[in-house]
Amino acid sequence: MLAFTLRFIKNKRYLATLAGALVIIAGLTSQHAWSGNGLPQINGKALAALAKQHPVVVLFRHVERCDRSDNTCLSDSTGITVNGAQDARALGKAFSADIQNYNLYSSNTVRTIQSATWFSAGRSLTVDKKMMDCGSGIYASINTLLKKSQNKNIVIFTHNHCLTYIAKNKRGVKFDPDYLNALVMHAENGKLFLDGEFVPG
């Protein structure tokens, strides 16, 4: 009887240890899924909540470019594909459901201008060639746009190397954006903070 009791106690301890280990593993797995590439994921609702506190800056990479795809071009061979234009329109519609009030900017390339135009479906677009130059000066350029926009939310269509630079510089993470991937920043007391990656939905 004593031997049975001792075995029962040991089994309970083993099961408790195993259960604890599984909880830890599950937590780590969940954290990894949440962080993905090391950036917090921000959906439309979270973005809208952030925009109520601070002016937000959303920087999108342009859509599928024509010169690197076998898909049908929208028009200019240096611009975007028809598929890319449709993707931009769909994303813009979903984005506007959460953020209605924003000013729109793009770099001075055909692909970013077309991406922004299809994303916005008629919203006024301002082209700024500084959104092509991505280094330490990018933050001053963004702050200039915020001032021009009188601290309204702004959406910028730019390039993958800009997003990669900001993610590395602000959070020390490697970010290799696909078409229409985006970063979310907010302005506070004249400074820009990287909040995470925009994930539609």
UniProtKB/Swiss-Prot annotation:
EC supergroup of this enzyme: hydrolase
Signal peptide: 1-35
Family annotation (Gene3D superfamilies): Phosphoglycerate mutase-like
Major localisation: periplasm
Pathway: Bacterial outer membrane biogenesis; lipopolysaccharide metabolism
Any GO molecular function: phosphatase activity
EC number: 3.1.3.-
The UniProt record lists the keyword Membrane: no
Gene Ontology biological-process annotations: lipopolysaccharide metabolic process
Taxonomic superkingdom: Bacteria
Transmembrane segments: none
Keywords: Hydrolase, Periplasm, Signal
Annotated localization: Periplasm
Ligase in keyword set: no
InterPro entries: His_PPase_superfam, LipoPS_heptP_Pase
GO terms under cellular component: periplasmic space
Family, as annotated: Belongs to the phosphoglycerate mutase family. Ais subfamily.
Biological function: Catalyzes the dephosphorylation of heptose(II) of the outer membrane lipopolysaccharide core.
Protein name, per record: Lipopolysaccharide core heptose(II)-phosphate phosphatase
Organism, as annotated: Salmonella choleraesuis (strain SC-B67)
Phylogenetic lineage: Bacteria, Pseudomonadati, Pseudomonadota, Gammaproteobacteria, Enterobacterales
Gene coding for it: ais
